């Protein structure tokens, strides 16, 4: 049977036949013709595939698992490079006084790819569990003083995301930069000085449309405060219901006061600022209000992609936490309570990093504290419905064309 992709006409090149005499599609071997570069040349595989040099083998005591150990860590560094590449593109799109809303899909796509890579890494690191602790001991001596703590790209990634220096856990009671040389320190200093993703997201959220009151609309936050007060009043009414037993009344009253205190901490700007100073919150009050508005009205066309952005930011934090946790379990399994190859306290140090201190977008997780039932969510004015139904950049472009 003739291959359907050949079409009519004479055959001028070689044709390969499948088993049974079935023709495959016509093709040309461009390598034989000297056309362009090969797959191996394009990917520079001669460099990549010769970079797995086993120290144990050079010492005449080859340990096969060292090969896996090297490949896993090299693969991590390649993926870190891709995440940083995508992160820089996202930061570039956000680093504008007015973010082009027609570009938010690119931001969403970039963050989506980052989460997929991080998801892959959380699974990839578990491949090291296929080594036995005894096999690891056989080649561990060749690693000293090399340590994953010295991964420049991982620290660059943390800084570009927005991990605050004051929130870092001390490494052997020292600053994290002490393990890097002068060239690497310059790179790290630049990443500490430039705007992180957290800073850019904060500025973007502060400009959420409809957040502030105008002559035409009183704004989201004023309406939200009124709705919260109504919600709290209803909770107080439930607690004071004469039909409640003494025990139920006590529980409902305690719940009311706890809920009221939680809402007061976000409604009062001074309390919010105090939480920032205490290190419990990272986003400004206006940025937090913007995120709240996006949460409540995520079904509006103009907020659908911003809501996805906020979701992916939390996914990034979650996946980093999962990766750190998997790493901790791996180290505990392989080393127990031994000191790390770089001189750290090993398991104990790594376990301390699996905490909210390293969550860049912790405030987004905590937004659920101040969500109110749907029946209390403030209604949007007709003017605001129109505003949130049209992308500002698209509307401006269309009006310019009509002019």
From Swiss-Prot:
Q: In which tissues is it expressed?
A: Expressed in body wall muscle cells, hypodermis, PLM neurons and touch-receptor neurons.
Instruction: Report the GO molecular function annotations.
Output: heme binding; metal ion binding; tryptophan 2,3-dioxygenase activity
The entry assigns this protein to a family as follows: Belongs to the tryptophan 2,3-dioxygenase family.
Residues forming the motif PLD motif are 133-135
EC identifiers of the protein: 1.13.11.11
Q: What's its job?
A: Heme-dependent dioxygenase that catalyzes the oxidative cleavage of the L-tryptophan (L-Trp) pyrrole ring and converts L-tryptophan to N-formyl-L-kynurenine. Catalyzes the oxidative cleavage of the indole moiety. Involved in regulation of protein homeostasis, longevity and reproducive life span. Specifically regulates proteotoxicity due to age-related aggregation of proteins like alpha-synuclein, via its effects on tryptophan metabolism.
> Which residues are noted in the entry as heme-binding?
327
Q: Name one Pfam family in it.
A: Trp_dioxygenase
Q: In which pathway does it act?
A: Amino-acid degradation; L-tryptophan degradation via kynurenine pathway; L-kynurenine from L-tryptophan: step 1/2
Task: Describe how the cofactor binds.
Answer: Binds 1 heme group per subunit.
**GO term, biological process aspect, one:** L-tryptophan catabolic process to kynurenine
Residues annotated as binding substrate:
69-73, 140, 341
Catalysed transformations (reactions): L-tryptophan + O2 = N-formyl-L-kynurenine
Native source organism of the sequence: Caenorhabditis elegans
Following inactivation of the gene, the phenotype reported is:
RNAi-mediated knockdown of the protein increases longevity and causes a delayed and extended reproductive life span without increasing total progeny. Animals show increased levels of tryptophan, reduced sensitivity to proteotoxic aggregates of alpha-synuclein and reduced age-related decline of motility. A double knockdown of tdo-2 together with an enzyme downstream in the kynurenine pathway, kmo-1, flu-2, afmd-1 or haao-1, causes an increase in motility and tryptophan levels and suppresses the proteotoxicity similarly to knock-down of tdo-2 alone.
Q: What do we know about how this protein assembles, alone or with others?
A: Homotetramer. Dimer of dimers.
Q: What is this protein called?
A: Tryptophan 2,3-dioxygenase
Q: Which UniProt keywords apply?
A: Dioxygenase, Heme, Iron, Metal-binding, Oxidoreductase, Tryptophan catabolism
Does the record bear Lyase in its keywords?
Answer: no
């Amino acid at each position: 049977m003739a291959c359907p992709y050949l079409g009519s006409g004479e055959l001028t090149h070689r044709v390969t036949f499948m088993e049974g005499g079935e023709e495959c599609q016509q093709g040309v071997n461009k390598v034989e013709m000297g056309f362009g570069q090969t797959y191996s040349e394009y990917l520079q595989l001669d460099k990549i595939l010769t970079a797995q040099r086993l120290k144990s083998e050079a010492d005449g005591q080859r340990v096969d698992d060292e090969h896996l150990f090297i490949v896993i860590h090299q693969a991590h560094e390649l993926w870190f490079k891709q995440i940083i590449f995508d992160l820089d593109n996202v930061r570039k799109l956000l680093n504008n006084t007015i973010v082009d809303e027609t570009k938010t899909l690119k931001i969403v796509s970039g963050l989506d790819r980052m989460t997929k890579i991080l998801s892959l890494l959380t699974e990839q690191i578990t491949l090291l569990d296929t080594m036995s602790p005894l096999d690891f001991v056989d080649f561990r001596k060749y690693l000293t003083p090399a340590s994953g703590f010295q991964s420049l790209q991982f620290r660059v990634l943390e800084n570009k995301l927005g991990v605050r220096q004051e929130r870092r856990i001390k490494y052997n009671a020292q600053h994290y930069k002490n393990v890097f040389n002068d060239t690497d320190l310059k790179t790290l200093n630049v990443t500490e000085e430039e705007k992180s993703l957290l800073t850019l997201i904060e500025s973007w959220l502060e400009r959420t449309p409809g957040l502030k009151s105008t002559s035409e609309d009183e704004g989201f936050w004023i309406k939200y405060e009124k709705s919260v007060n109504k919600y709290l009043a209803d909770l107080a009414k439930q607690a004071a219901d004469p039909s409640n037993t003494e025990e139920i009344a006590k529980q409902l009253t305690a719940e009311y006061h706890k809920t009221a205190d939680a809402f007061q901490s976000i409604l009062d700007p001074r309390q919010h600022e105090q939480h920032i100073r205490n290190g419990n919150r990272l986003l400004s009050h206006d940025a937090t209000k913007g995120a709240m508005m996006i949460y409540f009205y995520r079904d509006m066309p103009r907020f659908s992609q911003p809501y996805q952005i906020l979701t992916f930011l939390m996914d990034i934090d979650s996946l980093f936490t999962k990766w750190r946790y998997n790493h901790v379990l791996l180290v505990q399994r392989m080393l127990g309570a031994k000191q790390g190859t770089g001189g750290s306290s090993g398991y104990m140090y790594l376990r301390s990093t699996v905490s909210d201190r390293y969550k860049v977008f912790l405030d987004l997780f905590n937004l659920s504290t101040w969500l109110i039932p749907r029946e209390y969510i403030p209604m949007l004015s007709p003017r605001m419905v129109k505003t949130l139904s049209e992308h500002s950049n698209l509307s401006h472009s269309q009006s310019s064309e009509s002019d």
